[in-house]
């Protein structure tokens, strides 16, 4: 198939976990520099720089969360399309079974010429089959 929703969701979970780790690292960076006890302009500069880096880390964590959300949406869409393909395959199969059982020989030749796409193929989305 064109994507494994379970694997995609696993990647999304990994990104969310990394986002949490990055946020934790940002918090630890600020806490360590605040706890250093360095006074004066040098200490102030260190703390300012650490807060800037922590902000950058939090932005990176947010981007990880955004990527994870995009992967979740993609996994949902893959699930939806796989169900749609399965439904179309089933309808086409039922139609072919009914048609072969009930139609004259001349139509059977036409039916024999229909070559369904492979199971799970995205080409099933192009097949038009009436609902039964």
Model regions: which residues?
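N-terminal secretion-targeting helices of virulence/extracellular proteins
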Residues: 1-132
